[in-house]
Amino acid sequence: MSNSSSRQHQGHFARKRFGQNFLVDLGIIDSIVDVIRPQRGERMVEIGPGLGALTEPLVERLATPEAPLHAVELDRDLIGRLKKKFGNLLELHEGDALAFDFGSLAGEGDKPTLRIVGNLPYNISSPLLFHLATFAERVIDQHFMLQNEVVERMVAEPGSKAFSRLSVMLQYRYVIDKLLDVPPESFQPPPKVDSAIVRMIPYAPHELPAVDEIKLGEVVTAAFSQRRKMLRNTLSTYRDSVDFEALGFDLQRRAEDVPVAEYVAVAQAVSAAAGT
């Protein structure tokens, strides 16, 4: 099979710049919908609907003209096809998910009302996950298809090689569970990596520790900036302002050995020292 034909599905050429790999395995699609459990009238948005493989069963289960499924899509060629296929049961938002205001779909009030799903483009998955975290207070849950390596980092425990900045920053915000493995042959064109389905449920505001998330991000970024070095080196800039001994924080460790709660404690101490 030629490279061009392998990238074509239903008359559409998958675009590398959009990270397009279309899900075609009906069994996997059914399994994904089963774990999402969409209900009629729910407020849901799909990121990157593509050719509508997941969109179709979601529309069937939850959409009405008064409460359509929402979708964010960047590829204009696909938008026309999706509009024609789903009509007023799908409300399309043309644009880049990295810049989209997901809070605008959550409705009035401050309670979580939005469910987010999608086969996320692997080339932007980490920045997109961080962008989505800014709307976590309005979100009920998220179900995503991602590169398996990314999912393993999301659910990694301290002490493992997969534990990373991504692990800390997302586990601070969400309860995260890996649900399903998805092989490359489930897609057209097949990606060069394995994939997985992950569920993310945001903690309620009262469950989150009081911490400046910008400070937390700075501390975690510094800690993981040189993974093989001890924290006494990577966090050296904080040693004048933070009493690590009083915190019970052992600097004779590497970044991947520190639980999320301890990073939060350091960030809180940094804020206290700065009077913020």
Swiss-Prot record:
InterPro entries: KsgA/Erm, rRNA_Ade_diMease-like_C, rRNA_Ade_methylase_Trfase_N, rRNA_adenine_dimethylase, SAM-dependent_MTases_sf. Its EC number is 2.1.1.182. One of its GO terms (molecular function) is 16S rRNA (adenine(1518)-N(6)/adenine(1519)-N(6))-dimethyltransferase activity. It is an enzyme of class 2 (transferase). It catalyses: adenosine(1518)/adenosine(1519) in 16S rRNA + 4 S-adenosyl-L-methionine = N(6)-dimethyladenosine(1518)/N(6)-dimethyladenosine(1519) in 16S rRNA + 4 S-adenosyl-L-homocysteine + 4 H(+). SUPFAM superfamilies: S-adenosyl-L-methionine-dependent methyltransferases. S-adenosyl-L-methionine binds at N21, L23, G48, E73, D96, N119. GO terms for cellular component: cytosol. This is Ribosomal RNA small subunit methyltransferase A. The lineage of its organism: Bacteria, Pseudomonadati, Pseudomonadota, Betaproteobacteria, Burkholderiales.
